Regions:
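Fe-S-dependent hydro-lyases/dehydratases of central metabolism
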Residues: 1-335
Length: 335
């Protein structure tokens, strides 16, 4: 539940830094008390958009509404737009250090957000259209500013990302972001405004309005009736028919400009990341008899927690100073 999100982040800090049973800074103590994260709580200044801001553990530096889980759910997309509308009306905005983006999986989403007048509100709080399809959840959000990257890495800050995708592996979203949270599109907007995962959005304000009055999540959260009134824009079947009537025959100008090879078999080029599988080297149409047993087998590797295939074969951006990055640079592959 949302009420335990901040506590979940403190557990992340504890997992990374170990635990400390001594008295810790009050702001770093989780709601349960007892064993708590080591009281590091480093706060450093980073220059973003020409101004200095304090970055600390839990600072949300990426907030993204992504394609993989929102296209088929107009209810939450309209909900996100209404959160943005209400926040905008109160003078709230994303925190300057939060990189925000909106990447629907379909142009239909853009059409009903525009028709409902919600895209303008999303734009106002930083959720501009970035494109369609896989972006942030595969590490393609674009990099953070050099100053922000340096502040995070040089001070071992556990920064956070909040996205409405379906992957939150360490470094999948960004190589320098270790704490990643999955949330609904409306909550992504709310956390972009709050700017930090250590806030309990059930009890603490997300920000202050133009008069300096605290604004809580309930003040900007839309009712079911408010969302329902705008659902008619998303339930227009003609929009879907228009966008998908001739996808194969007319895929669009960008796709038309992509060159491709022709033939029955793929012409494998020399590549640093695509290789012909070696088990096809002596491939025969008639399979050979399988061995009668397996002998001398051993485990290739035994790993601890929080290890995924992303650590073996990066699916997102690759660090230039890591082994894979150095190997690619040695082979003339530029970032």
């Amino acid at each position: 539940p949302l009420s335990t999100a901040a506590q979940s982040f403190y557990k992340t800090v504890s997992d990374y830094r170990g635990v400390d049973k001594s008295a810790a800074a009050q702001e770093m103590q989780d709601e349960g008390g007892g064993v708590i994260a080591a009281p590091v709580d480093v706060r450093k200044t980073a220059k973003v958009e020409g101004a200095d801001y304090t970055i600390r553990d839990g600072s949300v530096v990426i907030a993204a509404i992504t394609s993989c889980t929102n296209t088929s759910n107009p209810y939450v997309m309209i909900g996100a737009g209404l959160v943005a509308r209400k926040a905008r009306a109160l003078g709230l905005n994303r925190k300057p250090w939060v990189k925000t983006s909106l990447a629907p999986g379909s142009q239909v989403v853009s059409e009903y957000l525009e028709a409902a007048g919600l895209q303008e509100d999303l734009d106002a709080v930083g959720f501009n259209l970035a494109g369609y399809g896989c972006t942030t959840c595969i590490g393609n959000a674009g990099d953070l500013t050099p100053e922000l990257n340096a502040t995070i890495t040089q001070n071992d800050i556990i920064a956070a990302a909040v996205l409405s995708g379906n992957r939150n592996f360490e470094a999948r979203i960004h190589p320098n972001i270790r704490s990643n949270f999955l949330a609904s599109p409306p909550l992504v907007v709310a956390y972009a405004i709050a700017g930090n995962m250590t806030k309990d959005l059930m009890t603490e304000p997300v920000g202050k309005d133009t008069n300096g009055v605290d604004v809580y999540l309930g003040d900007i959260w839309p009712s079911s009736q408010e969302v329902g009134e705008l659902m008619r824009f998303a339930m227009n079947s003609e929009v879907f028919k228009k966008n998908y009537a001739d996808v194969k025959g007319n895929p669009g100008a960008l796709w038309e400009r992509v060159s491709s090879t022709e033939g029955q078999v793929y012409n494998w080029p020399e590549s640093t990341y695509i290789a012909e599988p070696p088990f096809f080297a002596d491939f025969e149409m008639t399979p050979k008899a399988a061995a009668t047993g397996i002998t001398g087998a051993r485990a290739l590797g035994v790993f601890g927690d929080s290890i995924t295939t992303d650590h073996i074969s990066p699916a997102g951006s690759i660090k230039e100073d890591g082994p894979a990055g150095k190997w690619l640079k040695d082979h003339g592959v530029l970032k």
